[in-house]
Amino acid sequence: MSARITPQTPALQALRMRLHAQHQPVVLMRTDCHVCRAEGLAPRSQVLIIAGDRTVQALLYQIDSDLLKTGQIALSEAAWDALDIHEGDLVQVRHPPLLESLSAVRARIHGHRLQTTELQAIVRDVVDGRYTDVALSAFLTATAVLPLDMQETIHLTRAMVDVGDHLQWQAPIVVDKHCVGGLPGNRTTPLVVAIAAANGLVMPKTSSRAITSPAGTADTMETLAPVDLDLDTLRKVVEKEGGCVAWGGAMHLSPADDIFVRIERELDIDTQGQLIASVLSKKIAAGATHIVIDIPVGPTAKVRSRETAEHLAHHLSEVAASFGLVLRCLFTDGNQPVGRGIGPALEARDVLAVLRNEADAPQDLCDRVALVAGAVLELGGVAKEGDGIRLAHETISSGRAWEKFQRICAAQGGFREPPQALYVEPLLATTSGRAVHIDNRKLSRLAKLAGAPESPAAGIQLQVRLGDEVTRGQSLMFLHAQTSGEMAYALAYVHDIGDIVKIEP
């Protein structure tokens, strides 16, 4: 989108209002502003703001007060940063160009399949900031009601790759992994990266923040080391240490994905086609050639049946093959959380316990890591078929994984210990018996109500596993919160929902 300030359109003086609106550009104008009247600009309409050769499309709000003087316009942080202006600079306001790709969204709402050019236009306009949250919600909802077919998924993946930057590596094999999610804990990625890099593989891992879970890999890793790496820094870290764990949103790799994720989080949806396009577009952009996908299967996991898992694996493999990727899917146990911690800092403590070979390190996390890392080592050609799990365990027990992890953290900006919550409350068993069911979804919801992932120290520390014998009054879990209000909110939820851990005599 190109435009320049012209003498024909009156200019307004820019005022920085320091409003944070989740990356959404917002502007405030007076209701009696001559530009609003001349251009016919209505409240909550989209407007184009021009400053020199820079532009940004923003949501307009109008005010009837002296907060703004005549001839002024106030901009949110997102709009201010996009224009790169200074206090008092002159800007112009116009109607934005017609959003032609929106017709394809309307067609998709009515059940029409989208072609390559239509999806490319939608993704380009999304990245250019031309889609409102309402329009984004319409597109994502349309692809949830009538799921993307194979060709649409391939086209969307390609479109998401094409609008971003790409990393290229000298190594012929570049490995990566992804977990489909829906399972609390299961923080294998930092460990798998350390194991892979310690064995000579290249693994530039870019991870996301939480969408609907209490913690994403980037949230957890951020409690241990900086993750906001730019492309140059990421490249230097990987060239030096062989691997990294960085937040993908800090770079321009598949930038549409970060925008889609923000809306998906608010809608609390995560559809198969979008999931595949999200995962593979980021892997392709990061330069991966060989990928392991962990698909936990369980009644309260994201994937609830083996049939659904096989369907997802088939579609992942088909889309991956169309881009020349080598992909292996693992079906893993999704009946209960992996590790004890649920929430960024608590999951990080589990990671450290395994890396440091601590006596009380969660064995299930160690075993899950060995399974996933073993597949990565075999796929990457540094372990023979069937020997990957043994090599992964040896890399941990020998201390090589811990040494490599510390070096990666140092290269990313320095290692730090994860924070501790200010408030901790036990949740006690109300009866004696055996733990026969753990509701993953209720656990995740509870951890989020306690403040995770926004409060990194918040979450849950689980004390029981399926099959454990429990006595009345025993701690089933510890609830961690950073504020008394969040703790009270979470405890009220526990009171309302009944058993999270089902105990039978």
From Swiss-Prot:
One of its GO terms (molecular function) is 1,4-alpha-oligoglucan phosphorylase activity. One of its GO terms (cellular component) is cytosol. InterPro entries: Glycosyl_Trfase_fam3, Glycosyl_Trfase_fam3_N_dom, Glycosyl_Trfase_fam3_N_dom_sf, Nuc_phospho_transferase, PYNP-like_C_sf, PYNP_C, Pyrmidine_PPase_CS, Thym_Pase_Put. It comes from the Bacteria. SMART domains: PYNP_C (SM00941). Keywords: Glycosyltransferase, Transferase. One of its GO terms (biological process) is pyrimidine nucleobase metabolic process. It catalyses: thymidine + phosphate = 2-deoxy-alpha-D-ribose 1-phosphate + thymine. Transmembrane segments: none annotated. PANTHER family: THYMIDINE PHOSPHORYLASE. Belongs to the thymidine/pyrimidine-nucleoside phosphorylase family. Type 2 subfamily. This is Putative thymidine phosphorylase. It comes from Parvibaculum lavamentivorans (strain DS-1 / DSM 13023 / NCIMB 13966). The lineage of its organism: Bacteria, Pseudomonadati, Pseudomonadota, Alphaproteobacteria, Hyphomicrobiales.
